[in-house]
Amino acid sequence: MAKKLSSPKEYKEFIDKFDVFLFDCDGVLWSGSKPIPGVTDTMKLLRSLGKQIIFVSNNSTKSRETYMNKINEHGIAAKLEEIYPSAYSSATYVKKVLKLPADKKVFVLGEAGIEDELDRVGVAHIGGTDPSLRRALASEDVEKIGPDPSVGAVLCGMDMHVTYLKYCMAFQYLQDPNCAFLLTNQDSTFPTNGKFLPGSGAISYPLIFSTGRQPKILGKPYDEMMEAIIANVNFDRKKACFVGDRLNTDIQFAKNSNLGGSLLVLTGVSKEEEILEKDAPVVPDYYVESLAKLAETA
């Protein structure tokens, strides 16, 4: 059963139990463009106590550098090597695991974050933010679109400019069984400014349904994300706690990764009633109203 943290004594005991804290960002540190009040105090406290901090996000629209800048703008100290968005884990997978040949490229259904990270590892790509694809499908497109042996993977993430044209291109590339089908994350929704919008999982579904193929998922709660982190940061998993706002990704990620603990904050997607359900499929070790509460130690 999940333990609710609700007193200064409990906050302190919780913090003292772990050496490493891994944080989701959207719904934990901020919601959309709005910082969650009081969170900076908690982050400063953890830094002052010498805790190791790692930021892990399924948001694929931003590169590591862009994420670092956003975190810093919210008054939270962060270094590039502490930041792991799904765009980074996806590019790492393409380069180090898929080992895409130099003559192959990736078709991106997503934003600049994915493109930036692919550029960083030297992987060629098309699609993505190409402005020529932000339009309706034309009759001449139907004649031109088809399988392309030079496309070695379709990488799908959050795409704010998704079009039927992009779907048609991705669909055709995926007719080649040797073309890998990759998904940055399967989040059904995307929290922003107190609202929920369709997420990467929802954007990928037309391709899953139409091709009959299942993508390799590279974000939380899957191992590929933790492997990308562990390849760069060494820590004792049993002394680490993941802090997130979504049960089926953040908390499940902590369990899949065999971390020492998990903390759900109630400032994002999942709510207290979901934890308290009799047969709740995923339950955190701890939960708290807001990350900001942890600064109220005795």
From Swiss-Prot:
Activity enhanced by Mg(2+) ion but inhibited by Zn(2+) ion. One of its GO terms (molecular function) is phosphoglycolate phosphatase activity. Keywords: Hydrolase. GO terms for cellular component: cytoplasm; cytosol; nucleus. It catalyses: 4-nitrophenyl phosphate + H2O = 4-nitrophenol + phosphate + H(+). The keyword Hydrolase applies. It is an enzyme of class 3 (hydrolase). It comes from the Eukaryota. The N-terminus is blocked. Homodimer. This is 4-nitrophenylphosphatase. It comes from Schizosaccharomyces pombe (strain 972 / ATCC 24843).
